[in-house]
Every structure is written in C-alpha cells, then in structure tokens.
C-alpha cells in the first residue's frame, strides 16, 4: 500500500517504541525542505535522530510486523466477538484499532471496566467508540473484554 502514497506515517508506540511516528516520504518533490518546515513549526525534537534509531531497529528483519501482528490478532478477536453480538462497526478496520457502534448504555457498561474513547457520535443514542490494542495487550484482558461484550 505504501507505494500508492506520497507520504504516510508509521506509528511507534503500539509496537513498543518510546514514542513518536516516522514520516515516510515517497514522493521526492514533497521532501524538498520538509525537514526545515517541521523545524520552523515546532515539530522537530532536539536529538530526534536518536529517536529514529528505534524505527530503524523496528524495520530490521520484519520486527515491526512481528510485533504488530499480536496487536492486530488481539483486535480481530475483539472484532469477532462484537460482530457475533450483532454490534456494528463504524469502519471494518484490519488494524489494531476498532470502532464499534455502541448504544450509550452499552458504552457506559463497558466503560466501568475498560478504557474506551468516543470517536464520533453516530446519533442521539449511539457512538462509535475507539477500542485499541497494542503489543502489550494480554490474552486475559481481551478475554475479559469479550466476556463483557457477550454480557451486554
């Protein structure tokens, strides 16, 4: 997919990086003075090249994808449980981020034990909620979330 984009970002924290996102510029015309534009607008970190080392390491030997696979697999388990329960998705995401459309009552019940965020109000009684997994999401946490979804 990257070959079809002029510019895209690669997130780091969901795969265990300290912080940050890598900006990948495929179109050389857009790279002209990009570094200076970031610096002038306050987006360049001091010693930021050191942070780049984490991305260089993550891109070696498919490590990024190996780590990300766990997050995606956990999200797919949750997705399957949501769909089995008849809960629609705002978008059918193949990533570690899910956006189930919950009633306000369902969201309230899940928020008692889980950290959800309202992504967008769908109507007066439904919201698309953001559910996100990471490299550190444990099976027990996903199992508990699935049980809570089944109990809705």
Language model features with spans:
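Conserved C-terminal alpha-helix-loop-beta "cap" of PLP-dependent enzymes
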Residues: 76, 81-150
């Amino acid at each position: 997919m990257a070959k079809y984009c002029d510019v895209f970002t690669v997130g780091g924290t969901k795969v265990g990086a300290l912080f940050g996102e890598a900006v990948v510029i495929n179109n050389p015309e857009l790279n002209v003075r990009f570094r200076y534009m970031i610096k002038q607008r306050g987006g360049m970190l001091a010693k930021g090249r050191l942070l780049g080392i984490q991305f260089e390491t993550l891109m070696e030997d498919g490590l990024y994808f190996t780590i990300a696979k766990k997050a995606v697999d956990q999200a797919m388990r949750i997705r399957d449980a949501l769909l089995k329960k008849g809960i629609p998705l705002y978008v059918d995401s193949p990533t570690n981020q899910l956006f189930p459309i919950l009633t306000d009552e369902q969201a309230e019940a899940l928020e008692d034990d889980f950290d959800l965020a309202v992504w967008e109000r769908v109507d007066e009684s439904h919201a698309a909620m953001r559910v996100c997994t990471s490299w550190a999401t444990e099976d027990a946490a996903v199992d508990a979330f699935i049980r809570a979804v089944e109990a809705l």
